[in-house]
């Protein structure tokens, strides 16, 4: 496990990965080590065939090809590190074929579904309802990753024009790889956040100074609402808004934000910047989504009817 600790320290220092990415690497490596232990194998003496057996083992446990590929990528990077540190001379993952998978188009909500969700949330005037309304408005208005949303600080979104501050329409957020990007939000989001700020103190635990700095403070260890808690609240709101909670998640709201922008004529490069995608190919998935919608729309063309 010593080598794993060294590898994770290197990732943190040199690649500026997020905590969630580091945890993902750690889980993959520990799972791999547990498999090797059960097979009575040493990480420094395994063969490519051993790695192929491990991949078959993962597939036999119904792990999706995309997840298997991520694990393979983690282990490959780990062995590259071991070689660079002279712990071994051989990367057993180098000549392993990656399982093939189909790119699944992202699931999105229709604009009417978004409106239904926001309409329900805006009617709940309890402190919890006002907070959730602000969070959903902000997420759909900005396309933030859920980890970015819940960990926003007051200073990220407030100006210093007044003693209490005013809600910014434009602010910056630190995303994946510590890359800063500009976020623009609409007037409805500004209003919902301002309404929430008026009751925010309800959620502040003054005994825990750590949570004072966050926009959405919580008694959770990090000082802000957890991603999991927000996802649960979102699904609960969907249920009350007569929407299927199985088809609603923070990430689906992010997908909906991007897809609706594209539908409205926004440039793909602009959407890439707003989402914080390093590679335009990641954003291009939304063009395939639009093509799918167009094909479905064409089914209603009069010449397509018998």
Swiss-Prot record:
Ranges where the Tyr recombinase domain occurs: 104-299
The Core-binding (CB) domain sits at: 1-83
Give GO BP annotations, semicolon-separated. cell division; chromosome segregation; DNA transposition
Which InterPro entries does UniProt cross-reference here?
CB (IPR044068), DNA_brk_join_enz (IPR011010), Integrase-like_cat_sf (IPR013762), Integrase_catalytic (IPR002104), Integrase_recombinase_N (IPR010998), Integrase_SAM-like_N (IPR004107), Recomb_XerD (IPR011932), Tyrosine_recombinase_XerC/XerD (IPR023009)
GO molecular-function annotation terms? Answer: DNA binding; tyrosine-based site-specific recombinase activity
Family named by the database record: Belongs to the 'phage' integrase family. XerD subfamily.
What this protein is reported to do is described as: Site-specific tyrosine recombinase, which acts by catalyzing the cutting and rejoining of the recombining DNA molecules. The XerC-XerD complex is essential to convert dimers of the bacterial chromosome into monomers to permit their segregation at cell division. It also contributes to the segregational stability of plasmids.
NCBIfam families associated with the record: PRK00283.1
Q: What is this protein called?
A: Tyrosine recombinase XerD
């Amino acid at each position: 496990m010593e080598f794993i600790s060294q590898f994770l320290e290197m990732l943190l220092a040199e690649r500026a990965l997020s905590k969630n990415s580091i945890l993902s690497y750690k889980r993959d490596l520990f799972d791999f080590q547990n498999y090797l232990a059960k097979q009575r194998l040493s990480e420094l003496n395994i063969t490519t065939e051993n790695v192929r057996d491990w991949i078959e083992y993962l597939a036999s446990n119904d792990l999706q090809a995309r997840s298997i590929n991520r694990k393979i990528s983690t282990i490959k990077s780990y062995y590259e590190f071991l070689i660079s540190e002279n712990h071994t001379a051989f990367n057993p993952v180098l000549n392993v074929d990656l399982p093939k998978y189909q790119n699944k188009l992202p699931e999105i909500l229709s604009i009417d579904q978004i409106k239904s969700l926001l309409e329900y949330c805006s009617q709940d005037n309890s402190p919890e309802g006002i907070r959730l309304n602000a969070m959903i408005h902000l997420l759909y208005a900005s396309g933030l990753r859920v980890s970015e949303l819940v960990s926003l600080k007051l200073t990220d979104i407030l100006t210093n024009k007044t003693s209490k501050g005013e809600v910014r329409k434009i602010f910056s957020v630190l995303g994946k790889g510590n890359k800063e990007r500009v976020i623009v939000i609409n007037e409805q989001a500004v209003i919902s956040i301002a309404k929430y700020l008026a009751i925010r103190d309800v959620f502040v635990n003054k005994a825990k100074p750590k949570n004072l700095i966050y926009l959405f403070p919580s008694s959770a260890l990090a000082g802000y609402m957890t991603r999991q808690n927000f996802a649960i609240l979102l699904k609960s709101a969907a249920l009350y808004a007569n929407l299927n909670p199985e088809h609603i998640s923070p990430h689906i709201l992010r997908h909906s934000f991007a897809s609706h922008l594209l539908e409205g004529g926004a440039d793909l490069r602009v959407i890439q910047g707003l989402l914080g995608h390093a590679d335009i190919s990641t954003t291009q998935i939304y063009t395939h989504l639009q093509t799918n919608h167009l094909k479905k729309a064409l089914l209603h063309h009069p010449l397509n009817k018998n």
